[in-house]
Amino acid sequence: MDIGDFVKLELENTTYSGTLMPSLNENTIVIKMKSGYNVGLDKKKIKNIEILESGDKPKYGLPPLNLEKNPKLKNISILSTGGTVASRVDYKTGAVHPAFTADDLIRAVPELMDVANIKGKVILNILSENMLPKYWAMTAEAIKEEIENGAEGIVIAHGTDTMHYTASALSFMVTSEVPIILVGAQRSSDRPSSDAALNIIAAVKAATEPIKGVYVLMHGETGDTVCHLHEGTKVRKLHSSRRDAFKSVNKTPIAEVNPVTKEVKYLRDVKSRDKSKIKEVVLNTNLEEKVALIKVYPGIDSEILKFYVDNGYKGIILEGTGLGHTPETFFEGIDYANENNVLVAMTTQTINGRVNMNVYSNGRELQAKGVIPCEDMLSEVAFVKLMHLLGNYEFEEAKELMPKNIAGEINESINLEC
């Protein structure tokens, strides 16, 4: 029995048929069923295996491809940090291959040839839950190198779980006249409902636009007619599996991008690039990694805060209830943090709306204890911002800058309800 064979597996009460695939576990047999889904079965539970059809030895062959730069199109670099947004599937085995040479990208998504001149580069190959702050700095350095080598737009392929953290980090780290677009896929490229190809087409299109800044581009609805371009510090993943999981919070998206017609419709004012400074990039990648994000809950113990202080943490983001509150029983821990020069700031776990710690006595008392209100900053953004500030400024200056708008993280509109 070889990889690629079409087999029938008999269990006690049922049978499964499909193409035999590679397995990472020697005790598990994996097959790809005709539905396109993979199933892994415990070898001990399999009563009988029948080879229905012998398969050819799997090959990952590529036809020759002649790529010539189109002088009428912009030069876009696509940097991969991992994920499946532009991977290529060998349907005989189900194996997923990274597709990050220019040739591979065009084969995976040939429509890109009509949008831009593509250069592909792998900088990381990790699951996004394994993203580390040092990788944000590595990504920023790769962006700088590509821009200085002539890239007129950057697309970063990223796993969706922590993409909003990375977008936030790059918003604080990178100052450039080139658009930086993070893109991912909620459905892998071997599934009929995959959003990978359309998202990357729309992201590359957005990267050719005359704008600057860091953005996230993902499906704007469950269908395939529109993708949304979100500001990097005002976006969050709000669903575990839907294709339109990413939403702008307390702001509308920057634009709608039709991945089929390639039309871009701006929904509000954007930051336009200065062509004369197209190769100028300023990086500030210093981060204080001893920062924690703590969700407040009924009965939360001050010992939690004391633990972080005693272990050398320099900053704490509290994701408080409502307008920015904690139980009074938590005040002791906040006093302890303040006495030890640990910067404590407050966001709200409601996600939408803004912190207002002047309404109730609880919030006013927290402010008196040195807790900084973070306006309508998302908790994840406040977490990254505090790492950035403490990595670059002294305590008092960081404390002063925390409630100020640096990279679009605060919506200063007086019309925002809270």
Curated annotation (Swiss-Prot):
Matches recorded under Gene3D superfamilies: 2.30.30.520, 3.40.50.40, L-asparaginase, N-terminal domain
Catalytic activity field: L-glutamyl-tRNA(Gln) + L-glutamine + ATP + H2O = L-glutaminyl-tRNA(Gln) + L-glutamate + ADP + phosphate + H(+)
Assigned EC number: 6.3.5.-
A family per Pfam: GatD_N
Asparaginase/glutaminase domain mapped to chain residues: 74-405
Protein task: Allows the formation of correctly charged Gln-tRNA(Gln) through the transamidation of misacylated Glu-tRNA(Gln) in organisms which lack glutaminyl-tRNA synthetase. The reaction takes place in the presence of glutamine and ATP through an activated gamma-phospho-Glu-tRNA(Gln). The GatDE system is specific for glutamate and does not act on aspartate.
Protein name stated in the entry: Glutamyl-tRNA(Gln) amidotransferase subunit D
UniProt lineage: Archaea, Methanobacteriati, Methanobacteriota, Methanomada group, Methanococci
Name of encoding gene: gatD
